[in-house]
C-alpha cells in the first residue's frame, strides 16, 4: 500500500514579514486594477499557508489541484475567463480570473466547491462583484469556515494562535496525501477499465479485434468513457473519507447522486450508449469503501498488502438489503432491465454481487494465482472464461434469455475442462475466436462478467501483479 502514498516536501524559503505585507498590498492593488479595467466579477485564489514558508512542493500540489478543479468547473459552466493571471510566488500562490458571471452565483459555486472535497479547505476563493465588494459566507447566512485542526471558527483560532504551526502543516500534509491517494485509486480504476477493454479476444465483447455483438460501440467508445469517469472514481474515494462518520447503511444514499453524475458524464461522451453503468456501480462502492477505511485508519501508510476481503465486506454492508428493492419495486416507477429480469427469473445481477461482497471474485482470485507461470494477459483470458462459466450474467439473459446464459456458461465450462487448451495461449486464442463468432451469431455479450473482470484487475493491482 505504501506506493500509493506521497509525502510532499515542506522545504522552502522563509519569507520576511515585510515581504508578506508588500505582497498583500500588491495583491489588493492588482485586484482593484482588474475590477476597474474590466468591470466584471473577479475571482481571487490564495492558499491557507501557515508559517514563514509560503511556497514548497506541498503547497504547489494544493495550488495545482485548485486550478484543476476551477478549470473543470468553468468548462462545466461553459464560461471562459476574460482575463487570467496565475502567480506561484515565493510569497504565496495567487490566481485571478475575471469572469462573465454574476458574482453571487459564483460565490455560491465557490462555497459548494470549498465544501465538496477535503482538500478544498485549503483554498481561499474570494469573489468580488463589479463594484469591488468582497462577498462573504455571512452574506448567504452561512457560518464561518472551520479550523483545519479542531473544527472551530477558523478566524478565532488564527487570531488567538491556538495551534502550533507544525500541527497545522501536518494537517495540510495529511489532506494533500489523502487527495493524492484518492487520485491514485481513480487512476488504477481507469487503468483496470482500459486493460479489460483492450484484452483480446473476448467472446461477444468489445475488444481490440472487433466490436463483438455490439453495433453501437467500439473500443474507442470504451476508452473515452473510461477517461470521462476517472475523476468520479477519485470523488468516490473522497466521498468515502467524508462520510466515514456515518453508519454503513447510510452510505448508499450518500453516494447515489455522485453515481448519477458519473452516468451523465458517461452518456455525454458516448452519445447515450451504456458502456460502464455496471462498472460505475461496482467501482463506486469499492472506491467509497477504500476512502472510508483510509479515514478510519484501517489502511495506513505502512501497510503492505491490500485487504480485498475487508473492502468487499464493507461493500456488502453498504448494500445490505439492496436486492429487497427488486422484490418490492414500486409499480408506479418505470421498470428497468434489472427489475424485469428479477421479476421473471429471480436474477439479482450486479446488486446481488455487491450485496454478497463480490464473492465470485474472491473465489476466483486463488485460481488466478494457480497460473502464475503464464503471462499476464493469458491469465486474464482464463479468468474471464471462469467468470463466464459461473456468473449468472443479466446482460446475457437480457439479450438471449436463459438459453443464451446456458450457452455461454456451458461453452466456457467445456473450454476450461481442457487444460492443454487453457495453458496453450495459441490454442486458447483460437478457441476464444470461435467462441466469439458463436456469441456474435447469437447476439450475446457477457457485459457483467467483463465488469467483474475489470474489478478483479483493479484488486490485483494492489498486490503488485
UniProtKB/Swiss-Prot annotation:
Disulfide bonds: none annotated. The keyword Iron does not apply. Coiled coil: none annotated. GO terms for biological process: prosthetic group biosynthetic process. It is an enzyme of class 2 (transferase). In the N-terminal section; belongs to the CitX family. This is Protein CitXG. It comes from Haemophilus influenzae (strain ATCC 51907 / DSM 11121 / KW20 / Rd). The gene is citXG.
Amino acid at each position: 500500500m505504501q506506493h500509493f502514498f506521497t509525502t510532499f516536501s515542506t522545504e522552502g524559503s522563509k519569507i520576511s514579514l515585510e515581504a508578506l505585507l508588500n505582497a498583500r498590498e500588491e495583491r489588493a492593488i492588482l485586484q482593484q486594477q482588474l475590477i476597474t479595467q474590466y468591470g466584471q466579477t473577479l475571482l481571487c485564489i490564495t492558499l491557507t499557508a501557515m508559517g514563514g514558508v509560503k511556497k514548497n512542493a506541498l503547497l504547489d500540489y494544493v495550488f495545482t489541484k485548485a486550478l484543476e478543479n476551477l478549470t473543470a468547473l468553468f468548462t462545466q459552466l461553459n464560461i471562459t475567463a476574460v482575463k487570467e493571471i496565475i502567480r506561484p510566488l515565493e510569497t504565496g500562490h495567487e490566481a485571478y480570473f475575471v469572469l462573465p458571471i454574476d458574482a453571487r452565483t459564483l460565490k455560491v459555486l465557490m462555497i459548494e466547491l470549498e465544501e465538496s472535497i477535503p482538500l478544498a479547505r485549503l483554498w481561499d476563493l474570494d469573489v468580488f462583484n463589479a463594484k469591488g465588494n468582497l462577498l462573504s459566507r455571512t452574506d448567504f447566512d452561512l457560518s464561518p469556515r472551520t479550523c483545519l485542526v479542531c473544527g472551530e471558527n477558523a478566524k478565532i483560532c488564527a487570531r488567538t494562535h491556538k495551534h502550533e504551526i507544525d500541527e497545522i502543516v501536518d494537517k495540510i500534509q495529511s489532506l494533500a496525501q489523502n487527495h493524492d491517494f484518492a487520485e491514485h485509486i481513480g487512476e488504477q480504476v481507469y487503468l483496470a477499465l482500459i486493460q479489460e477493454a483492450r484484452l483480446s479476444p473476448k467472446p461477444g465483447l468489445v475488444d481490440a479485434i472487433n466490436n463483438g455483438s455490439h453495433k453501437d460501440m467500439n473500443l474507442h467508445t470504451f476508452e473515452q468513457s473510461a477517461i470521462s469517469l476517472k475523476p468520479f472514481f477519485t470523488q468516490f474515494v473522497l466521498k468515502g473519507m467524508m462520510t466515514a462518520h456515518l453508519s454503513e447503511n447510510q452510505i448508499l444514499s450518500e453516494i447515489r447522486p455522485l453515481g448519477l453524475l458519473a452516468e451523465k458524464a458517461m452518456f455525454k461522451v458516448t452519445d447515450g450508449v451504456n458502456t460502464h453503468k455496471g462498472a460505475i456501480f461496482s467501482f463506486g462502492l469499492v472506491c467509497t469503501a477504500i476512502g472510508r477505511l483510509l479515514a478510519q485508519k484501517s489502511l495506513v501508510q505502512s501497510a503492505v498488502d491490500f485487504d480485498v476481503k475487508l473492502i468487499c465486506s464493507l461493500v456488502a454492508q453498504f448494500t445490505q438489503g439492496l436486492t429487497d428493492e427488486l422484490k418490492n419495486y414500486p409499480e408506479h416507477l418505470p421498470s428497468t432491465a434489472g427489475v424485469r429480469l428479477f421479476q421473471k427469473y429471480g436474477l439479482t445481477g450486479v446488486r446481488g454481487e455487491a450485496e454478497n461482497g463480490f464473492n465470485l471474485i474472491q473465489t476466483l482470485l486463488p485460481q488466478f494465482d494457480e497460473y502464475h507461470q503464464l503471462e499476464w494477459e493469458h491469465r486474464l483470458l482464463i479468468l474471464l472464461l471462469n467468470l463466464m462459466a459461473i456468473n449468472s450474467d443479466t446482460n446475457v439473459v437480457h439479450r438471449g434469455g436463459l438459453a443464451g446464459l446456458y450457452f455461454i456458461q456451458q461453452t466456457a465450462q467445456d473450454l476450461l475442462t481442457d487444460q492443454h487448451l487453457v495453458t496453450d495461449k495459441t490454442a486458447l486464442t483460437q478457441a476464444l475466436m470461435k467462441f466469439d463468432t458463436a456469441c456474435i451469431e447469437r447476439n450475446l455479450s457477457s457485459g457483467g462478467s467483463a465488469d467483474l473482470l475489470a474489478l478483479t484487475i483493479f484488486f490485483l493491482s494492489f498486490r503488485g501483479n
